Structures are given as C-alpha cells and as structure tokens.
C-alpha cells in the first residue's frame, strides 16, 4: 500500500469532488461497493456515480462543513470519524458519521461501510439490517473488553468504572447527547440498563492501541430479543488506561431504546 492510499481520508472516498471521481472508481479492487444507512447497498460503477453525484450535490445545497474527529489506519482496514455541520430548517444541524474502509493487500478498496443515525436528519430512528456476520473469535482487549462485558451484563458500576474521571459517551444524535463524568454516565447507563444488559454480536474491529472501532449487531436488550441491527462504536483510550470516550453511530437501538 503506498502512502497516499494509506492516508487517504475515508470521507473523501465516499464524497469525492467531481475531478476525483474517475480515479476513485478505479481505486476499488473490483466494482465500487458501499453500504449507506439511507441508500442501502450501492454496488457497481453506475450506481456509485449516481450516489456520489447526489451526495456531492447535497453537501453543496446544505452548506456542509466537515469537522474531523479521528481515524485509524491498519493494513487491511481503517476507519474515520467526522461530524457534518449543515443548514437545517431550524438552524445548524450536526451529524456524526463514521466510515469503515476494507482494503486488499494491494491497498485497493474492497468495501466501504457508512454509519450514522437518521435522527438528526428527520427525527426518526430506523433499524438497519446487519452488514456483517458475527466473528466468534473477535475479542477486545484491556478496557474495551471490560466495557463490553459490563455492557452485556447491564452492570452500571462496572461500565462507569471503565471510564476516566472526565470520560464521556456520545450518543448517535451528537453533541446534544453527551454524558461526561462519572455522575452523568451513571445516570445515563442506569436508564439504558433499565430492562437489562445489552450483549452485542461483535463483527469486525479496527484497533491501533489508542482507539478501537467495533462494528456489531444488536440482537438483544435485556430480556427482549430483537431483529438483528447493525451499529458501530468507537472507543478512545485515555492516559490513565481507561476510556476517554465512547462514541456510538447508527440506529441499532431503534426498536428498544428507552430514551
């Protein structure tokens, strides 16, 4: 993989400028393929060109600015987080977006997966069918694994203990749904676990030691079995070895969320 391929922002791959589109189409290992929460599966050169054209037009019409949040690039998979700020009917809107890029051994793109909640767009949460199969061998290490076990068990104390003193969880809706510090986190997770724990099917991860992006399927909330729904979260490790941040993407909890 050359340096330009390794460090190319995933956002630019999903929403290219017109002069870059031909080169981007050629950068896929086979035909372009991506999964978008609204468009669904987009596969093939023609479909990808239509998608890219529509998205570029939307970015322009909505006066969108892009705030970089974070990224991690590994040999075969990487992710990027951004926040889109754009003009809404009642003022500025922000939409957190995460993008995962799978690449072949030659650095060419195999698949792109996009995660965001539809709530900031239209006030609705829409369950998204699974994009990936669960990987039974996938195990998260250190504090990320501790958090996942506490989440599955519905253990409020253990979840809160996994965070740094000033750590936070950001819900998919964005900055208006941030729970920072142990007291705020405790209140949030007490409500979240009111019906029990939230075990996830772990499907794929990107972990560079500082951040861990986990793609998963939500299949159960407490005692309630749910239709499998795709989601993604990014966990940032702090200097103290605990979580500095947990940022959630998508509407996997659309059918079960108590808040």
Language-model segments: which ranges?
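A solvent-exposed, acidic/Ser-Thr-rich amphipathic alpha-helical stretch
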Residues: 5-7, 21-77, 157-158, 162-210
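A beta-strand edge to alpha-helix "cap/lid" segment located at domain peripheries
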Residues: 53-141, 186-259
